[in-house]
Amino acid sequence: MRQILFAGAIGLFLTLVGTPLLIKLLARKGYGQFIRDDGPRTHGSKKGTPTMGGIAFILATIVAYLLAKVITGEDIRYSGLLVLFLMAGMGLVGFLDDYIKIVKQRSLGLRAKAKMAGQLIVGIAFAVLSLQFPNSMNYTPASTRLSFVEDFGWSIGPVLFCVWALFMILAMSNGVNLTDGLDGLATGASVMVFGAYTFIGLWQFQESCANADNLTNPSACYEVRDPLDLAVVAAALMGACFGFLWWNTSPAKIFMGDTGSLALGGALAGLAILSRTEFLLAILGGLFVMITMSVVIQVGSFKMTGKRVFRMAPLQHHFELKGWSEVLVVVRFWIIQGMCVIVGLGLFYAGWAAKK
C-alpha cells in the first residue's frame, strides 16, 4: 500500500512542478501546436500552444515508480517494467510524430506507414516479452487466454495472442489520440481509468492465488503475476496525469500531443492485458471507445451513402459545432467517463463475488 501512495504522490508532485518548466522550454524553442484549418473556428486561438507535454507525465511516471520502489525497499517486477516500456515506446512514436508536425509544419506528422510501423514494433516487442519471465508459480506477465474480469478457460495460443495484444494497443493508443481534441478531456478521462486500475491491482493482490492458503475463498483468487506492481504503475500514472491536468485544463497552457496520447493508450492496454481485464477495458475506458466509434461511423457512413452522421468527428467536435462550449463538452464527457468507470468496477467486483 505504501508503494501505491508514494508512486501517486511523487507522480503528482513531479508534473505539478515540472510541467511549467517544460512549458517554458517548449515555448522558447517554438514547439507550438499546429491547428488544422478544417477544425472548429474556436480552436484558432490554440495555435502556438506548447505541445509534446506527454514528456512530462511519461518521465514523471517512470521516476515515481522507481522512487516508490527505492523508498519502500520493494523489488522491481517485470509486469511494471513491461507497462512502462510500452508507455515509453508508444510515447517515442508520438514524439517523432509531434516533432515532424512542428519542424516541418505538416499537420499530419509522420507518414501513416511509418507511424504504424513504429507502433507495430513496440507492440510486438511488448506482446512477445509479456509471455516470458515465469515466476515460481509459472505465471507469466500476460496469458494466452482472453479475459474479462479474469481469464477465460481456453487459450488462443501465442501467435493469436500477439495479434490480439497488437489490436488492443493500437485501438487504445489511437482512441486516446482521437479523444485528445479538447483541453483536459483525454487527461481527465485517463486519470479516472488509471484510478480504476490502481484499485483493481490492489484488489487482485489481496485476493491473489499466491496467497490462496490465507484466503477465505481461494476459488475466487486471481492468477495475475504482479498485481501490486501494476497498481503502483497505475497510481504513478494517475498522479502524474492529475498533476498535468492542472496545466492542461481550459485554457490549456500545454497539450500532451501524440507523445502523450499514444503513451497513455499504450499504458491502458498494457495494464488491461497484464491484469487479465482485456474486455473490461472497453467499459472502463468507455469514453475512448465511444469517441473512436464516432469516427468509424462517420467514415463508414460517408463512404457508403455519401452522408455524414455527425457534423464533425470525433464526437466532441460535433457538440462544439452544435453550440456547446468547450468546457461544457469536457465536463459532460468526464461525467460519462466516470459512469463508465463505476459500471466497470461494479462488474469487476461482481465477477469476484459470483465465485464466493
UniProtKB/Swiss-Prot annotation:
EC class: transferase
Record's bilayer topology term: Multi-pass membrane protein
Subcellular location: Cell membrane
Catalysed conversion reaction: UDP-N-acetyl-alpha-D-muramoyl-L-alanyl-gamma-D-glutamyl-meso-2,6-diaminopimeloyl-D-alanyl-D-alanine + di-trans,octa-cis-undecaprenyl phosphate = di-trans,octa-cis-undecaprenyl diphospho-N-acetyl-alpha-D-muramoyl-L-alanyl-D-glutamyl-meso-2,6-diaminopimeloyl-D-alanyl-D-alanine + UMP
Transmembrane segments: 3-23, 51-71, 80-100, 114-134, 152-172, 185-205, 227-247, 254-274, 279-299, 333-353
Keywords from the named record: Cell cycle, Cell division, Cell membrane, Cell shape, Cell wall biogenesis/degradation, Magnesium, Membrane, Metal-binding, Peptidoglycan synthesis, Transferase, Transmembrane, Transmembrane helix
Protein EC: 2.7.8.13
Pathways involved: Cell wall biogenesis; peptidoglycan biosynthesis
Cofactor(s) it depends on: Mg(2+)
Gene Ontology terms for molecular function: metal ion binding; phospho-N-acetylmuramoyl-pentapeptide-transferase activity; UDP-N-acetylmuramoyl-L-alanyl-D-glutamyl-meso-2,6-diaminopimelyl-D-alanyl-D-alanine:undecaprenyl-phosphate transferase activity
Alphabetized Pfam families for the sequence: Glycos_transf_4, MraY_sig1
Cellular component, GO annotation: plasma membrane
Biological process, per Gene Ontology: cell division; cell wall organization; peptidoglycan biosynthetic process; regulation of cell shape
InterPro entries: Glycosyl_transferase_4 (IPR000715), PNAcMuramoyl-5peptid_Trfase (IPR003524), PNAcMuramoyl-5peptid_Trfase_CS (IPR018480)
Domain of life of the organism encoding this protein: Bacteria
HAMAP family: MraY (MF_00038)
Classification via NCBIfam families: mraY
Primary role: Catalyzes the initial step of the lipid cycle reactions in the biosynthesis of the cell wall peptidoglycan: transfers peptidoglycan precursor phospho-MurNAc-pentapeptide from UDP-MurNAc-pentapeptide onto the lipid carrier undecaprenyl phosphate, yielding undecaprenyl-pyrophosphoryl-MurNAc-pentapeptide, known as lipid I.
Family to which the UniProt record says this protein belongs: Belongs to the glycosyltransferase 4 family. MraY subfamily.
Protein name: Phospho-N-acetylmuramoyl-pentapeptide-transferase
Originating species: Streptomyces griseus subsp. griseus (strain JCM 4626 / CBS 651.72 / NBRC 13350 / KCC S-0626 / ISP 5235)
